[in-house]
């Protein structure tokens, strides 16, 4: 049926009018303003979560050594648990008056049994700290002064000699004066860690070595009178700090950054930290985080921990079966590398000591006490050191010594009775049971899987330049 043109026009107007009314009603029903607001809220949440995540990863990697150090400082200067292994108030020393054995290792990982340890946590926020060292008459000792950024300076035989000395630990901006007989040692952060080692040459030397360690003491400058203080300090009980893996990490980082001077070249980075409430110019409060911010930071913690764990393998190079880490003690802007090193512990500068380690033999198989091994040094391959060297074996699962029948936990150039061949070479026997022949050169090893750690104190330049490496580990 055909309609006249006039009727067709009226019909189209009616249909179009109805459609317009329908769309107006639909728009009123769906409220475009609410659609825009909803999308904006999603965008804001995405931005907040992404910023918290990306900046949070950077902040976690940057702050890892700071929080590791401040947590340990709190836990070892307060009584935080029953039968605590290490405790000494701030600016006091804790002395291990014994060589490390399986029974006395405490919380030390892969400890040495060649030196007496002593340690303390310093706080020079208000005034310098005096460090007294006695005349060791050439005996090896070292004190590693580690700041909150895990960077190290040394007092000891290599750097300051072995005569009786007085030092003052000061911050870079300290403007006071010291007596002429006190040498300033600058450390970048007002808080940090002192870890000392003093050589013991044998059981008959133990008493004298302990006496020397007792003559190493600390005293705030304002109390200094040339003599160690007998002042008693009150023991303080406290809850244990453990911030890693939680939002408490960022709260502690925020508190710590507020106490530290701005480092050159880091202003922009710390300004970013401010954006998520972690930097030094704001105050972090986990209770005020929005759900997207919380989600982003929690994700950042997990991924940053994974990055650090993966990066621990990049800090070590393997040569001839031995893994040697030389790039420690000074880090600059290499925050991931710094965190990876701290994950495994704190070390001396390479010039002070190096620690080649091995978990595989010359064929790439895991070392196990069910087999026997041999390491042979020809005369020109003996470790080139100005201090001393030694070799120790540890259980692989926990980096601790395993008891053995002769109580020997290291062997090296200072071991009494060690035997060289006619040409001046040296062969070390590594096995769980006592060798059939002479045992002078025997290092007992754990029954199961184990790792070897060689210690090179005051390594010569050829070691630092990779011109010397330990010989391979031969499975017999």
Regions found by a protein language model. Give the residues of each.
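Hydrophobic core
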Residues: 23-28
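Active-site-proximal segment of zinc-dependent metalloprotease catalytic domains
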Residues: 1
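A compositional/structural signature for long, glycine/proline-rich flexible linkers
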Residues: 29-476
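N-terminal Sec-pathway targeting helices
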Residues: 4-21
């Amino acid at each position: 049926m055909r309609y006249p043109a006039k009727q067709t026009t009226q019909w189209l107007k009616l249909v179009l009018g109805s459609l317009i009314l329908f769309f107006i009603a639909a728009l009123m029903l769906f409220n475009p303003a609410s659609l825009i607001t909803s999308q904006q809220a999603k965008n804001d949440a995405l931005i907040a979560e992404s910023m918290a995540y990306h900046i949070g990863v950077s902040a976690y990697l940057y702050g890892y050594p700071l929080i590791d150090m401040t947590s340990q400082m709190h836990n070892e200067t307060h009584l935080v648990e029953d039968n605590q292994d290490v405790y000494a108030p701030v600016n006091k020393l804790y002395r291990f008056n014994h060589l490390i054995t399986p029974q006395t290792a405490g919380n030390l990982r892969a400890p040495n049994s060649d030196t007496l340890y002593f340690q303390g946590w310093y706080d020079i926020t208000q005034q310098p700290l005096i460090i007294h060292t006695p005349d060791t008459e050439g005996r090896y000792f070292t004190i590693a002064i580690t700041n909150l950024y895990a960077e190290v300076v040394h007092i000891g035989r290599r750097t300051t000699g072995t005569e009786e000395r007085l030092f003052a630990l000061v911050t870079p901006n300290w403007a006071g004066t010291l007596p002429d007989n006190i040498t300033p040692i600058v450390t970048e952060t007002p808080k940090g860690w002192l870890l000392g080692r003093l050589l013991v040459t044998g059981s008959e030397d133990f008493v004298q070595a302990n006496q020397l360690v007792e003559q190493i003491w600390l005293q705030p400058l304002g109390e200094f009178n040339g003599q160690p203080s007998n002042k008693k300090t009150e023991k303080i009980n406290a809850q244990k700090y453990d911030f890693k893996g939680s939002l408490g990490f960022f709260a502690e980082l925020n508190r710590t950054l507020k106490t530290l001077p701005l480092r050159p070249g880091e202003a922009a980075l710390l300004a970013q930290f401010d954006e998520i409430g972690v930097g030094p110019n704001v105050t972090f409060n986990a209770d005020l985080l929005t759900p997207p911010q919380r989600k982003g930071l929690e994700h950042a913690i997990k991924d940053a921990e994974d990055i650090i764990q993966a990066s621990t393998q990049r800090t070590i190079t393997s040569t001839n079966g031995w893994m040697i880490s030389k790039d420690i003690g000074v880090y600059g802007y290499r925050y991931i590398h710094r965190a990876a090193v701290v994950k495994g512990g704190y070390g001396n500068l390479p010039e002070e000591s190096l620690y080649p380690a091995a978990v595989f033999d010359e064929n790439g198989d895991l070392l196990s006490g069910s087999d026997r091994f041999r390491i042979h040094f020809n005369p020109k391959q003996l470790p080139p050191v100005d201090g001393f060297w030694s070799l120790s074996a540890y259980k692989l699962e926990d980096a601790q010594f395993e008891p053995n029948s002769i109580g020997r936990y290291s062997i090296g150039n200072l071991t009494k009775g060690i035997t060289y061949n006619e040409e001046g070479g040296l062969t070390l026997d590594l096995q769980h049971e006592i060798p059939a022949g002479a045992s002078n050169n025997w290092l007992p090893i754990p029954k199961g899987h184990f790792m070897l750690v060689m210690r090179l104190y005051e390594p010569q330049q050829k070691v630092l330049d990779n011109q010397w490496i330990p010989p391979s580990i031969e499975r017999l």
